Amino acid sequence: MAMVLMFTTCPDQEVAERLADGALTAGLAACILKTPVDSLYDWQGKRAAEGEVVALFKTSVAKADDLEKWLAENHPYEVPAIIRIGARANESYADWLAEVLEA
């Protein structure tokens, strides 16, 4: 079954937890993975190196637009990276995902 993986970077674990909890509570994601990363990027003409937390949201195709909008509205970054990837899950996981998101 088709599903969507959507990820964003957060400034810290607290923000990642807040976004994860909010998405779960709103029924927009069935599961969120969080992991610390080191990010290197250019911002406003300067090179930046920051510790961040990647939050990977697992959701349905039907909920993806709403999740993306919700993340954009609730993210603390001025320009958050909210990246959507189409994916395919094994049948039992896809059934669980659908059940959770329909509840």
Residue ranges and their predicted role:
Residues 1-103:
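Positively charged, small/polar-rich N-terminal and surface patches that mediate targeting and assembly
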